[in-house]
Amino acid sequence: MSVSNPPSSGKPLKLRVNKDSEGYLSLVTESGEVYKCPICGNDKFVYNYERGEAVCIVCGAVVQEQLLDLGPEWRAFTSEEKGQRARTGAPLTRLISEALTTVIDWRDKDVSGKELDIKRKLEVIRLRKWQTRARVQTSYERNFIQAAQELERLRSAMGIPRPCIEQALEIYRQALEKELVRGRSVEAMAAAALYMACRMMKMPRPLDELVRYTKASRREVARCYRLLLRELNVKVPISDPILYISRIAEQLKLSGEVVKTAIDILQKAKKAGITAGKDPAGLAAAAVYIASLMHGDNRTQKDFAVAAGVTEVTVRNRYKELAKALNIKVPVK
């Protein structure tokens, strides 16, 4: 049975998309009827990915707008080939591997927040004990779990994207396998791995900002970072100061015009060769500071220093260098 939806109908049909072996679409209504083109009666369509439209292959009529193709982009002709190309299934992440199971909460309360009675409380204590025994077996697993929990805490506190945490866990795993963690604190190694991961993913964070959220000192984290660089033979790209601009502007609620001007300033500074050997966060803070002054936003250098995680002196020095080299006439407020 088939149905066609005339162009003049008031309420559009909700259509389900099927894709055949040739790559053509067939549209099926909620009642299971095959949808046909209202112009020529054809039942095969192609999908316009740029516009999200289903187009008839015979007459070219757009039969459905804002259509979401939820199927795979690949084609398979056998069930074996389909299984090989499928990418669905449970997400495999570093955060749920290596015995990283759930934890029974230490607060003896039920789902509504009420205290458990004494009998139930003793039962939960016993279950928690066995959960801990069954969850972790080796020192390797215990160490890795501590690092994963520390990285998850840093992610929550600093708002770091999850891909950076995944990369940091991979770096920490390599350090564990090479026994680089022995004799060093988990907090320092985890922070160093996260600092490296953020730079590798081109989402850098200043080291001073990272240190504010961890128990380890700046010296410990820097030492562990140099150790990871040396022993893991990891190529970390040089941080581009432009990557810091959006975060600084977001924290200070600056306009898009200020961001664009700051990017232009740093691009000119790169061409002039005055960015080499300078702290990228300090350069970004100075560029955003200059751009904000040019657009009439007279905030203090301290505001930009705090947002970038650098000192006020650094912002002032980088400001003077940029203003002099690029001949920018903006007075210091």
Curated annotation (Swiss-Prot):
Zn(2+) binds at residues 37, 40, 56, 59. One of its GO terms (molecular function) is DNA-binding transcription factor activity. Keywords: Metal-binding, Repeat, Transcription, Transcription regulation, Zinc, Zinc-finger. A zinc finger (TFIIB-type) spans 33-64. InterPro entries: Cyclin-like_dom, Cyclin-like_sf, TFIIB, TFIIB_arc, TFIIB_CS, TFIIB_cyclin, Znf_TFIIB. GO terms for biological process: DNA-templated transcription initiation; transcription preinitiation complex assembly. CDD domains: CYCLIN_TFIIB_archaea_like_rpt1 (cd20549), CYCLIN_TFIIB_archaea_like_rpt2 (cd20550). It comes from the Archaea. GO terms for cellular component: transcription preinitiation complex. Sequence repeats lie at residues 149-232, 243-324. HAMAP family: TF2B_arch. Stabilizes TBP binding to an archaeal box-A promoter. Also responsible for recruiting RNA polymerase II to the pre-initiation complex (DNA-TBP-TFIIB). Belongs to the TFIIB family. This is Transcription initiation factor IIB.
